[in-house]
A protein has these predicted regions:
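Structural signature of extracellular appendage/secretion-system components
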Residues: 1-439, 443, 448
Length: 448
């Protein structure tokens, strides 16, 4: 009769060995499976009536270093952040082109400079004039295109933030469901939680790629997930994120000004609290990197405009001078807005129908105006135009129109005028007309 218990003991040993081999085989087969961890089957002695009746498989445990896992989550968040930024930096690199590329801004600026040099050698050349206008149009079109694309990229980044928020909410649902299963199996003493724990760790990895997180475990096997700033994302139930993507971005559409929606949890805006992950990278792209690029582009455009206008205003109209001009700058309150001519001067020359000079003066040296309001300056110029010591044009008018634009009109089409900047002794002082934005329309180099 002792043979049967002995056979039972041997059989249990064989079954236990078979189970262990199955687990080892699974470990080998899944060595390259993402999220899979090594499983270890614990053997336990079977006691019946005080006697050993063989062995059986006990709890199947995982070989996991929890500290290493948390370090991985932090590194994964940083990687998600940098990957998101790199994706958009690659797009902007393509947009801007290489310095030596034909469509780059630097190449367009160089082409405009060449066109200016060529036209300066023969200002009567129609071909040179056309080429100059064409190169200026190419440059401005290119800069406008880049500006539009920058704003599209900002809008795309915000849409990707919304997509990441949706993905995070799905991952929180997954973690919540796995929590429930793990807690249930743990309380009932069922085996089989190891694979569920693997799935939960994999969900944590995916979540950490989107934003910076940390977690802690409760005795029942449940985990609580928070941001690294302590904002709860999962505690018994998910705390969902929300974000409404902007329909269309523009340079004035910003998160700081309220034009772009924040990222909310339980009604609290956590945008500034997100420290890492792809969402942080996208926020950086949308609110810092691309706006900085836009600012640099605007600065370049402003510098080009100021420099070209400054040089342009040192010349005169060709071939015909005008009898009236209207500026491009808008003055909101010309009675209070001030202008000061620190260096250099502005010369006014009046011509008759034969192109003969009939009168000339300068704003500072002749008229005697070096500082004051826009209205005061306009009155001084008008007084000179009407005076007997000047061109004696009683119908002449100088002022600010209903649109806030400064205008000069001789009041007699038989008399035209030219305005020329005169540089002072200091470098870079021939810029007075740029201050009031008066320019002659037949000067083809004008950018306004």
């Amino acid at each position: 009769m002792a043979l049967i218990p002995s056979l039972g003991t041997s059989l249990s040993g064989m079954k236990t060995a078979q189970s262990q081999l199955s687990i080892i085989s699974s470990n080998v087969a899944n060595v390259d499976t993402e999220g899979y961890t090594r499983k270890i089957a614990q053997q336990k002695n079977v006691i019946l009536a005080g006697y050993s009746q063989g062995v059986s498989i006990g709890e199947v445990t995982r070989k996991v270093n929890e500290g290493l896992l948390k370090s991985y989550l932090a590194a994964n968040s940083l990687n998600g952040n940098l990957a998101a930024q790199n994706s958009y930096l690659s797009k902007t690199e393509i947009l801007l082109g290489t310095p030596e590329g034909e469509n780059s801004v630097s190449a367009n600026v160089a082409a405009l400079q060449t066109a200016f040099d060529s036209f300066a050698s023969d200002v009567t050349s129609s071909a040179g004039r056309y080429n100059l206008l064409n190169q200026a149009d190419t440059l401005t079109s290119r800069m406008n295109y880049i500006s539009e694309e920058i704003q599209k990229l900002r809008g795309d980044a915000d849409m990707n933030i919304a997509a990441d928020v949706d993905e995070i909410n799905k991952l929180l649902d997954t973690l919540d469901n796995l929590n429930d299963q793990i807690v249930k199996y743990t309380l009932l003493g069922y085996d089989g939680t190891a694979d569920l724990l693997d799935q939960r760790d994999q969900a944590l990895r995916s979540l950490s790629e989107k934003m910076d997180i940390t977690y802690f475990k409760r005795d029942n096997g449940e985990i609580v997930v928070q941001t690294t700033n302590g904002i709860t994302l999962l505690d018994n139930d998910p705390h969902y994120l929300s974000h409404n993507a902007v329909a269309q971005a523009s340079p004035t559409t910003t998160y700081a000004a309220g034009g772009i929606d924040g990222i909310y949890v339980n009604g609290e805006d956590i945008t500034a609290s997100i420290k890492d992950g792809s969402i942080k990278g996208l926020i950086e792209v949308r609110d810092v990197i691309l706006p900085s690029l836009q600012s640099q582009l605007d600065e370049l455009a402003g510098a080009l405009k100021a420099q070209i206008n400054s040089v342009h205003n040192q010349g005169t109209a060709y071939p015909n001078t005008p009898s009236e001009l209207t500026g491009t700058r808008t003055f909101i309150d010309p009675d209070k807005q001030q202008i000061k001519i620190a260096e250099g001067d502005v010369r006014f020359v009046i011509f008759d129908t034969n192109g003969k000079q009939v009168a000339t003066t300068s704003l500072k040296g002749g008229i005697g105006f070096d500082s004051g309001s826009i209205s005061e300056m306009a009155q001084e110029i008008q007084d000179w135009l009407r005076s007997a010591d000047g061109p004696n044009l009683p119908q002449a008018e100088v002022g600010v129109d209903k649109n806030g634009k400064l205008f000069i009109n001789t009041g007699d089409s038989n008399y035209t005028f030219s305005i020329i900047d005169e540089a002072g002794s200091a470098a870079g002082t021939a810029q007075q007309l740029s201050l009031i934005h008066i320019s002659e329309p037949t000067r083809h180099a004008q950018i306004s």
